[in-house]
């Protein structure tokens, strides 16, 4: 008999006879174990044990295949039975699928352990570790019950990988190895049929981390021979230690841009002779970038701004959104998320720009021209030194040939459209229409797909799409359509007809951000002056779009005022006179 028992039976007397129990209705010997998640507090068994969507271990044979999700598999294999005295006295058990074994489901951190059961109620359980022995279970009336044998064919669940196996990175900064629910991680200490399904990373401060205490009864290191097996019910990936990075970022004062640029250890071209006249391959650098950005990306994926960030990056790669607008949007997202312990995506991008550029003065000027402030350019000197060392160590560890180059510079976006390709696309659309995109993509070549051709035509080259600033009528129509359709930008763009969904989304958020900034007396003065100058020419109406551009050139606010906003503000001021 294989019994999953608990070392602490103090709460066994609190179990009511009316509790429910799960038992198997499938007699197939497919060796599937389900490790349920049970609250660690001492409660009665009145609440049904719930199996989470992703937290389970499946141990099965190679000749059988299971495509169900954990929740579907659990519901298909288990059905509810009333807890009766005829089955088990005093203890809640679950019958394991396909075997005459019972699983103790006590509500305890060490609930998933293999240990000999104590004598319970009127039943005296004779237990033996030897799987070849047949044991009889007798009750007080000396009634002989069917014998239950410890099955030699069922392998014990493998011990969970330690945090050093999950996070085997030698970097000192905080890194995360992403293992989604579809990837499988095999344990080297068990048979090849053992499979872990690992959830997304959690903070080490949560009670679900791997840093749980070991069982005091655990004596054997081999998971196949150990009787006591401690397995936490919700196994998750945790982040590696980042004490050195966090301590350096909090203990040192960020220097000024001049101090940052004057340090020889900051520039990637001067930090080591490894970078003086050589460069790593794109694949190696990309791998290091992913490792560096992974903590920030993992936090953004779980935030409510995930879709907005993905759309912004996509627009920038397709050259539909300038870098200045991208940085402005990222700054606004940073304000909405708050100043937490993790760095924002904007800070990470600024650091990467400084690392990749060999002429930092040029990069500083470039960032300032695109709206980056001095306070955002200053970063921690010790942290940047750690980043450079990690990049260098990570690239040195690759057994690949280092390519020589005079300078690296920033990478161009993938599949960037040239003028010749854009002209050819216009010609092919006039010849074939705007439906046969696969055919057009084959004729253009250059690795372009049909979707890329369609997006480039609809968002960039289509003559019906207007470019540049919005006038007051377009913006007023935009707000009405957003009130009608919500943030379904495709529906909004289909009714506007002269703007793409990307333009509609960008203009809407830009207008909302501008309206949150109060008008200053200086702005009101400039607005009144420009309107008076425009009215002197009575042959034409007031051009609010041109007036908003003049307001933007005055640089009284960081966010330019829109044409509709200028019009509303002017009539509001004159109504008060």
Curated annotation (Swiss-Prot):
<protein>
    <recommendedName>
        <fullName>Myb-like protein N</fullName>
    </recommendedName>
</protein>
<feature type="region of interest" description="Disordered">
    <location>
        <begin position="240"/>
        <end position="264"/>
    </location>
</feature>
<dbReference type="InterPro" id="IPR009057">
    <property type="entry name" value="Homeodomain-like_sf"/>
</dbReference>
<keyword id="KW-0539">Nucleus</keyword>
<feature type="domain" description="HTH myb-type 1">
    <location>
        <begin position="403"/>
        <end position="465"/>
    </location>
</feature>
<dbReference type="GO" id="GO:0048870">
    <property type="term" value="P:cell motility"/>
</dbReference>
<keyword id="KW-0804">Transcription</keyword>
<dbReference type="InterPro" id="IPR001005">
    <property type="entry name" value="SANT/Myb"/>
</dbReference>
<keyword id="KW-0805">Transcription regulation</keyword>
<feature type="DNA-binding region" description="H-T-H motif">
    <location>
        <begin position="437"/>
        <end position="461"/>
    </location>
</feature>
<feature type="domain" description="Myb-like">
    <location>
        <begin position="518"/>
        <end position="570"/>
    </location>
</feature>
<feature type="DNA-binding region" description="H-T-H motif">
    <location>
        <begin position="489"/>
        <end position="513"/>
    </location>
</feature>
<keyword id="KW-0238">DNA-binding</keyword>
<dbReference type="InterPro" id="IPR017930">
    <property type="entry name" value="Myb_dom"/>
</dbReference>
<feature type="compositionally biased region" description="Low complexity">
    <location>
        <begin position="213"/>
        <end position="225"/>
    </location>
</feature>
<dbReference type="Pfam" id="PF13921">
    <property type="entry name" value="Myb_DNA-bind_6"/>
</dbReference>
<feature type="region of interest" description="Disordered">
    <location>
        <begin position="206"/>
        <end position="225"/>
    </location>
</feature>
<dbReference type="InterPro" id="IPR051575">
    <property type="entry name" value="Myb-like_DNA-bd"/>
</dbReference>
<dbReference type="GO" id="GO:0006355">
    <property type="term" value="P:regulation of DNA-templated transcription"/>
</dbReference>
<feature type="domain" description="HTH myb-type 2">
    <location>
        <begin position="466"/>
        <end position="517"/>
    </location>
</feature>
<dbReference type="GO" id="GO:0005634">
    <property type="term" value="C:nucleus"/>
</dbReference>
<dbReference type="GO" id="GO:0000981">
    <property type="term" value="F:DNA-binding transcription factor activity, RNA polymerase II-specific"/>
</dbReference>
<dbReference type="GO" id="GO:0000978">
    <property type="term" value="F:RNA polymerase II cis-regulatory region sequence-specific DNA binding"/>
</dbReference>
<keyword id="KW-0677">Repeat</keyword>
<feature type="region of interest" description="Disordered">
    <location>
        <begin position="1"/>
        <end position="23"/>
    </location>
</feature>
């Amino acid at each position: 008999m294989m019994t999953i028992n608990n070392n602490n039976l103090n709460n066994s007397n609190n179990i009511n006879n009316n509790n429910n129990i799960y038992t198997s209705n499938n007699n197939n010997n497919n060796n599937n174990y389900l490790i349920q998640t049970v609250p660690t507090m001492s409660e009665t068994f009145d609440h049904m044990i719930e199996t989470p969507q992703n937290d389970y271990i499946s141990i099965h044979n190679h000749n059988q295949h299971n495509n169900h999700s954990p929740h579907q598999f659990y519901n298909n294999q288990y059905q509810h039975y009333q807890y009766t005295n005829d089955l088990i006295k005093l203890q809640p058990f679950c019958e394991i699928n396909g075997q005459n074994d019972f699983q103790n489901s006590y509500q305890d951190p060490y609930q998933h352990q293999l240990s000999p059961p104590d004598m319970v109620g009127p039943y005296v359980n004779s237990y033996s570790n030897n799987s070849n022995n047949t044991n009889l279970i007798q009750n007080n009336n000396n009634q002989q019950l069917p014998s239950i044998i410890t099955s030699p064919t069922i392998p014990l669940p493998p011990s969970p990988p330690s945090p050093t196996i999950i996070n085997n990175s030698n970097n000192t900064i905080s890194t995360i190895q992403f293992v989604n629910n579809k990837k499988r991680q095999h344990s080297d200490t068990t048979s090849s049929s053992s499979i872990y399904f690992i959830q997304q990373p959690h903070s080490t401060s949560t009670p679900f981390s791997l840093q749980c205490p070991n069982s005091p009864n655990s004596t054997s290191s081999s998971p196949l021979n150990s009787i006591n097996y401690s397995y936490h019910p919700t196994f998750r990936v945790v982040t590696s230690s980042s004490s050195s990075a966090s301590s350096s970022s909090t203990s040192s004062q960020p220097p000024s841009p001049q101090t940052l640029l004057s340090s020889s250890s900051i520039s990637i071209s001067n930090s080591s002779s490894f970078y003086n006249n050589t460069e790593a391959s794109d694949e190696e650098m990309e791998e290091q970038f992913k490792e560096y950005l992974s903590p920030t990306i993992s936090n953004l994926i779980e935030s409510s701004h995930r879709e907005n960030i993905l759309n912004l990056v996509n627009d920038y790669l397709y050259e539909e959104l300038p870098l200045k607008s991208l940085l402005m949007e990222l700054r606004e997202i940073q304000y909405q998320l708050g100043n937490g312990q993790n760095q924002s995506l904007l800070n990470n991008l600024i650091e990467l720009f400084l690392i990749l550029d060999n002429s930092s003065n040029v990069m500083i000027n470039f960032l300032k021209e695109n709206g980056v402030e001095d306070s955002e350019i200053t970063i921690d000197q010790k942290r940047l030194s750690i980043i450079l060392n990690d990049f260098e160590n990570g690239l040195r560890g690759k057994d690949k040939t280092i390519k020589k180059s005079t300078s690296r510079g920033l990478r161009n976006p993938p599949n960037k459209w040239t003028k010749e390709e854009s002209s050819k696309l216009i010609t092919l659309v006039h010849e074939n229409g705007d439906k046969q995109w696969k055919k057009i993509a084959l004729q253009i070549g250059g690795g372009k797909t049909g979707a890329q051709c369609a997006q480039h035509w609809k968002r960039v080259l289509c003559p019906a799409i207007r470019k540049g600033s919005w006038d007051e009528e377009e913006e007023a129509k935009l707000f009405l359509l957003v009130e009608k359709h919500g943030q379904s930008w495709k529906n909004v763009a289909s009714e506007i007809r002269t703007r793409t969904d990307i333009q509609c989304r960008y203009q809407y958020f830009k207008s909302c951000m501008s309206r949150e900034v109060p008008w200053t007396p200086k702005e009101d003065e400039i607005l009144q002056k420009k309107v008076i100058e425009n009215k002197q020419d009575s042959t034409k109406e007031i051009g609010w779009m041109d007036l908003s551009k003049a307001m933007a050139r005055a640089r009284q606010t960081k966010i330019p005022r829109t044409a509709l906003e200028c019009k509303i503000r002017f009539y509001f001021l004159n109504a008060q006179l």
